């Protein structure tokens, strides 16, 4: 049960980070609610494919790239080359942050790297670390790649950090 909740949490944080990144770097092509609904639909398909592929890493990376591309192309003002570049960039950052999370947890607890997939609590801890790093990376990269060099209010984007820390609190309570 905790593993499924964590997986849904992972996809929601990835969607939120992607939309925040795209909103800061590109202009919105459609209205924000329709872009959000499109993103939720894309990530629902992504979640289903992830479940059918039994959380296969290669399928996860490839399909994550495709979902990022579709959201960038349909929901935001990105041309094909830019959408491909940013999709590859975000897929690479996501892979790197997940690998860092796995290495940190396996090093801290002295366990095999593959054990996090069979232990729901370790999986949740890896998810919290990886998604926090992913969100921070998206915010930092969007500061450098934003087309508009005007002042951007950073206050609201940091509210997304509440979710990883609150999930750690919930895990501790369980």
Model regions: which residues?
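Intrinsically disordered, low-complexity linear regions
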Residues: 4-8, 39, 55
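Primarily extracytoplasmic/secreted proteins
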Residues: 10, 15-19, 39-43
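Juxtamembrane segments at transmembrane-helix boundaries
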Residues: 16-33, 50-173
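Hydrophobic transmembrane alpha-helical segments in integral membrane proteins
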Residues: 1-14, 124-127
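Alpha-helical hydrophobic membrane-insertion segments
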Residues: 36-44, 48, 140
């Amino acid at each position: 049960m905790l593993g499924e909740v964590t997986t849904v949490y992972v996809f929601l944080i990835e969607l939120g980070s992607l939309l925040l990144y795209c909103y800061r770097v590109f202009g919105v092509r459609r209205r924000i609610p329709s872009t959000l609904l499109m993103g939720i639909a894309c990530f629902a398909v992504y979640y289903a494919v992830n479940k059918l592929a039994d959380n296969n890493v290669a399928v996860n990376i490839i399909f994550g790239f495709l979902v990022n591309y579709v959201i960038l192309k349909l929901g935001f003002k990105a041309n094909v080359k830019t959408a491909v570049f940013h999709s590859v960039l975000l897929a690479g950052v996501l892979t790197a942050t997940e690998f860092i999370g796995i290495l940190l947890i396996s090093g801290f607890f002295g366990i095999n790297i593959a054990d996090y997939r069979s232990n729901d609590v370790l999986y949740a801890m890896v998810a919290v670390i990886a998604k926090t790093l992913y969100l921070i990376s998206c915010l930092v990269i969007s500061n450098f790649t934003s087309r508009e060099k005007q002042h951007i209010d950073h206050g609201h984007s940091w509210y997304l950090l509440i979710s990883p820390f609150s999930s750690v609190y919930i895990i501790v309570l369980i």
